[in-house]
Amino acid sequence: MARYCGPKNRIARRFGANIFGRSRNPLFKKPHPPGQHGMQRKKKSDYGLQLEEKQKLKACYGMILEKQLVKAFKEVVNKQGSVTKMFLERFECRLDNMVYRMGFAKTIFAAQQLVAHGHVLVNGKKVDRRSFFLRPGMQVSLREKSRKLQSVKESLENKDESSFPSYISVDKSNFKGELLISPEQDQIEAQLPLPVDVSVVCEFLSHRT
């Protein structure tokens, strides 16, 4: 499965936030955007702002691919209800993101690796597709041998119970979690490492699908 393999620190510096939760914050040494003119601020066009919001959303969920953005938008654009809410939910309820939200991994990239390497179960069955969409009532757990991974243990130990979103429940002692309800847009946005104008992203995609 394709995934982003580019420089993650440059992405974090571009947006001025340690969005990937790395222990070595890339902003400590270079708190400005990358590039020769990183210290200068340029006024962006409307198109430039749309591109930036799109890139921010992709970064918040582990550098998801362009085709995944387009696919998610096509799946919700003609449905009844809030398009922006349903669109954002497509990424928040991805299996890799839920593994991260439940504290089984320190970063979204570590969560992607756990899923891809077959460490994760959904309703008791192995699922190794990172983009698998969870629905309310679905349970996420780790395989018995995977619970012994030092990285998993450390991640859960460092995760405060109060930091879990209200739309999930987590049983740390049994390495299990459950998506309780479909999260609202404001609940999802509260979990993002930086603000994203999702309506701008949807407007951008509406002209390209």
From Swiss-Prot:
Name its species.
Chlamydia abortus (strain DSM 27085 / S26/3)
Q: Quote the protein name from its UniProt record.
A: Small ribosomal subunit protein uS4
**PROSITE patterns with a match to the protein in the record:** S4
Fetch the Pfam families from UniProt: Ribosomal_S4, S4
Which domain of life does the UniProt lineage start with? Bacteria
Annotated GO biological process: ribosomal small subunit biogenesis; translation
User: What gene is it encoded by?
Assistant: rpsD
From the record, what ranges are coiled-coil? none
The cross-references to NCBIfam families, in alphabetical order and at most eight, read: PRK05327.1 (NF003717), rpsD_bact (TIGR01017)
Protein purpose: One of the primary rRNA binding proteins, it binds directly to 16S rRNA where it nucleates assembly of the body of the 30S subunit. With S5 and S12 plays an important role in translational accuracy.
- Quaternary structure (record): Part of the 30S ribosomal subunit. Contacts protein S5. The interaction surface between S4 and S5 is involved in control of translational fidelity.
Query: Which SUPFAM superfamilies does the protein's record reference?
Result: Alpha-L RNA-binding motif
What family name appears in the similarity comment?
Belongs to the universal ribosomal protein uS4 family.
Domain S4 RNA-binding, first and last residues per copy? 93-156
GO CC entries: small ribosomal subunit
Q: What keywords would UniProt list here?
A: Ribonucleoprotein, Ribosomal protein, RNA-binding, rRNA-binding
Q: Name a GO molecular-function annotation.
A: rRNA binding
